[in-house]
Structures are given as C-alpha cells and as structure tokens.
Amino acid sequence: MLFTYNPLSGKGTVKQALSDILTIFTKGGYEVLVRPTLCAGDALEYISRNAAEFDLIVSSGGDGMLHELAYGIYASKADVPCGYIPSGTINDFAASLRIPKNIIRCAEMIMQENFLPVDLGRFNGGCFAYISAFGWFTDVSYVTGQKSKARLGPLAYVLTGLRSFEPKYLRENSGRVRIVWDGGDIEDEFIYCMIGNTHSVGGMRSIVPDGASLTDGLLDCMFVKTPHSLADIDKIKQIVINHKFDSDRTICIKTAGLSISCEKPFRWTLDGERGGEYTSAQIDVLPGALNIAVPPQA
C-alpha cells in the first residue's frame, strides 16, 4: 500500500495519529510505504508514476490532496483502488460519500475494502474529482489563509465569501459565456458556472443542483446569470440561503459533456484548488473512473 498525506492539512491531525493509522493498515495485511507530501503536486507526480506498483493507494489531506489522488490514478492508467482520509476544513467529496470524518474510523473503514466506482471529470485533458467552476464564490477555498481555516474552520470560508456580493467582485467575476451540451446551448452573461459530481460546495448544499449524483455517469451543472439589479442580487442570495432557484437567473442541467467559451479568461477552480485561467474548456464525465473505499451504507 501507498499512504500519502499532507502534514499541514487541518491542524496536523494525521501526523498526530500516524502510528495508529499505520497499525490499522498493517493489521489489515498491508506493507505500507509512507510519503508525506513536500509541496503542491508532489503526491500527483508520485502516484501518476508509481500507482501500478501498489494494491491500494490511500491519501489523507484536504480537497487538494483528493485532487492529486484522483488525478494521479487517472494519469497512471492503473486499475488500482484507493481510500481517502479527509483532514481538511470542509471535505465536500468525503461528505458526499459519507466517508467518516474521524481519522481512525476512516482508516478502519478503508480496511473493510468496500469499494465504489465513482465518476470523475475530465477538464481540457486533465482531471478533477468533484468540481470544476469559475466565477462567484469559487475562489474562496484557495484565497482563504491556511491559518484562518485551521483556527476558524468553515466560518473562515463564510467570512472570506462575504466579499462575493460586493459590486466590484461581481463585475470582475462575470462575463459573456457560451455553453454547448448534448441537449442544447445558451449564450448569456454569467456570474457562476459549476460542473461537477458533489452534493455540496464549500460545505453548502444550497449551490448544488437537486439530484446530484457521483455514480450516474453524468455531470451536474449549474449556471447563474449575472445580476443587473439589487433584485437580481437578492435572487442569488436566495440560492445560498434557501436553495431557491429562480428560473430566470439559474440554469441546471445534467450532461455527459459540454464545451464552454468565454469572452475573457476566467480563473477556474478544480477541486477547490487553482485550476488556471482559460477562455474555453471542454469538460466530459469519466464514468466510474475512481474505485474508492466507502462505508457499506454509502
């Protein structure tokens, strides 16, 4: 088994519990190679080159580590199952699959070897585990400081996200976008574009379409049109507060793939991390591409 972990994630809880985690894995019959990550991209590079050498790959950290785990296995083309021990601030993907928040319970759950093939997304040839997005609120996870996240937890995201309703922020993070999918197309001014497989974003279920699934072979997409009045801004706030979608401002679709063209470069987030700036993106589902350990009831 390969076990990679981010020693800086959360409050260093994995590092503190490392001996107990390794004991659980050893009792489960595995010889374990342990690799703490040294920098961003470290786990992705190692997993993509060496995944085929292991019977099981387990990673622990926040959403960034999850991204590297999924992308690394995808890039390796190896048919290897995996486990994920969430130790970040929010952990949307883990929550969607009911993966235990308690580190020890999660390690024990992985040793039950109950694996579920879940969908991944392909983004311009790359890969994401649960979300690709740009626009309103999408940069909160990576512009919020690590110290603030460790000290305040989810509240840190809320405090950072309050600026998302400032007029200057709304102007800078919206623009004309053309979206084409297998069931139609639309061109308009958009403030928020989200494509993924998750039940929550930033810990909030309100900004994810109803009926979202990680195993249906489809991407769950939501697009919010740019507000042009205080009334429009109030409608957007209702999405966050009450999960109330206004048909005039919001478009929700399920699709196996779509293309997005923008009049200006937008900053994308992939699994809560910086994904780069693009004026166009081709996004497709990768059905059942990640075989991950989940609780029996997930």
Give short role names for the model-derived ranges.
Residues 18-21, 74-75, 145-146, 209-212, ...:
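Short, solvent-exposed amphipathic alpha-helical segments in soluble enzyme
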Residues 124-218:
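ATP/pyrophosphate-binding catalytic subdomain of soluble kinases
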Residues 3, 34, 179, 221-223:
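Generic preference for hydrophobic
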Residues 181-182, 213-216, 223-298:
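ATP/nucleoside-binding phosphotransfer catalytic cores, i.e., glycine-rich phosphate-binding loops
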Residues 14-18, 205, 233-234:
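Conserved strand-to-helix beginnings and helix N-cap segments that scaffold or border functional pockets
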